[in-house]
């Protein structure tokens, strides 16, 4: 979506904002565990506890649908792939900012059962959820480290032995594509890796959080006009999301049930046991992943998915640097002129999450050291 292509949607956004200056919280989400804090906040009445109204979250099918619904103003609070926020603000000129991280980790590279090594993906196709995704960044790093090159070709096109064809698919389409051998792997958010395991159509080759420690996958993205014109409302939105993250960390099995098709709100089509495998895995599963090599950095003590809201600037800076060296289809010329430090300052508005953290005990409440700086650890 170019800046010109976004204009009609932005016109709709402006019209909606003018017509409804006190709009309630309208969440747009995909049926993935990335959405957990937003859905928990809605289910547990945390927005209402802050004194604001929230409509039932809107389930969308693809990342393209999520960003289009957001740009046009149909929804006003979304979880969005962190690289997509860079593309939206600087490539499509969308007036919106990151206000918090929604979760960390929570993604993996799943491959066909007969694939035992990343190098065996040479000459085959692997699906990604979106060109601007941490999945694409991490996958291409893994491919390079294994002597492979990412390419973008038509499905079925001839590939060299060291080429891996990247295809974009909605997350829900990935397990069927893997089962039918249309692709030989995919890298995506949970629970679609756990789903492949349950269906016995794939195995987890590597967790992304074991490549980039505590990386953000999805972040909370909000319209700039809400942040500027409704700062108190915006603060309450972020308060609710931060409290939802804390609740989820302490009620993982309950969260899996809440999000599942067995839950009262049926937020996702997933079974509780599939979501439980992600949110509340057993110790025996951790040992199995250590043995298989899906987890190589045991000392990182990464959870399959975890939650903490602070958007560390070092992550945004490193993400921008890596996006410049990542194969991305479409008009990506805007990336060349981006300054990582300036983007970290301009793309993110952390005043709301800092206040929200202060009210719940700071970063220590999430098991982190106080202070809003860290160093990025990336080790494929």
Ranges and model annotations:
Residues 316-380:
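Conserved C-terminal helix/tail region of periplasmic/extracytoplasmic solute-binding proteins
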Residues 32, 61-64, 130-134, 172, ...:
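Soluble non-cytosolic domains of exported or imported proteins
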Residues 82-84, 171-280:
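Pocket-lining segment of extracytoplasmic ligand-binding domains
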Residues 6, 45-48, 148-150, 325-335:
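Short helix-capping/linker segments at secondary-structure and domain boundaries
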Residues 230-338:
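Secondary-structure end/capping motifs
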Residues 18-169, 177-180, 184-197, 201-214, ...:
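Short, glycine-/small- and polar/acidic-enriched structural segments
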Residues 1-17:
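N-terminal export signals
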């Amino acid at each position: 979506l170019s800046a010109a292509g976004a204009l009609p949607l932005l016109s709709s956004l402006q019209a909606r904002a003018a017509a409804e200056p006190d709009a309630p919280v309208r969440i747009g989400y995909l049926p993935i565990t990335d959405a957990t804090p937003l859905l928990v906040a809605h289910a547990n009445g945390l927005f209402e506890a802050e004194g604001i109204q929230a409509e039932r979250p809107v389930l969308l099918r693809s990342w393209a649908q999520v960003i289009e619904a957001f740009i046009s103003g149909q929804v006003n609070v979304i979880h969005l792939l962190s690289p997509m926020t860079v593309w939206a603000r600087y490539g499509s000129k969308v007036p919106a900012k990151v206000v918090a991280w929604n979760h960390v980790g929570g993604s993996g590279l799943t491959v066909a059962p007969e694939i035992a090594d990343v190098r065996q993906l040479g000459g085959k196709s692997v699906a990604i959820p979106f060109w601007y995704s941490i999945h694409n960044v991490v996958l291409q790093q893994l491919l390079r480290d294994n002597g492979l090159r990412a390419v973008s070709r038509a499905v079925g096109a001839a590939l060299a032995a060291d080429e891996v064809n990247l295809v974009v698919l909605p997350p829900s389409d990935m397990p069927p594509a893997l089962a039918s051998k249309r692709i030989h792997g995919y890298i995506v958010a949970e629970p679609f890796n756990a789903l492949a395991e349950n269906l016995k159509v794939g195995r987890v080759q590597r967790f992304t959080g074991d490549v980039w420690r505590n990386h953000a996958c999805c972040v909370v993205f909000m319209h700039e006009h809400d942040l500027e014109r409704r700062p108190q409302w915006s603060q309450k939105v972020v308060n609710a999301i931060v409290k939802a993250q804390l609740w989820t960390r302490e009620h993982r099995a309950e969260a899996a049930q809440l999000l599942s098709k067995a839950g009262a709100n049926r937020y996702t089509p997933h079974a509780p046991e599939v979501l439980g495998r992600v949110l509340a895995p057993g110790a025996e599963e951790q040992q199995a992943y250590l043995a298989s090599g899906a987890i190589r950095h045991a000392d990182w003590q990464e959870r399959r998915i975890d939650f903490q809201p602070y958007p560390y600037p070092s992550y945004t800076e490193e993400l921008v640097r890596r996006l410049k060296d990542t194969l991305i289809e479409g008009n990506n010329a805007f990336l060349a002129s981006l300054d990582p430090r300036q983007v970290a300052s301009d793309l993110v508005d952390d005043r709301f999450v800092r206040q929200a953290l202060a009210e719940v005990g700071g970063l220590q409440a999430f098991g982190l050291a106080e202070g809003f700086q860290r160093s990025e650890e990336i080790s494929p």
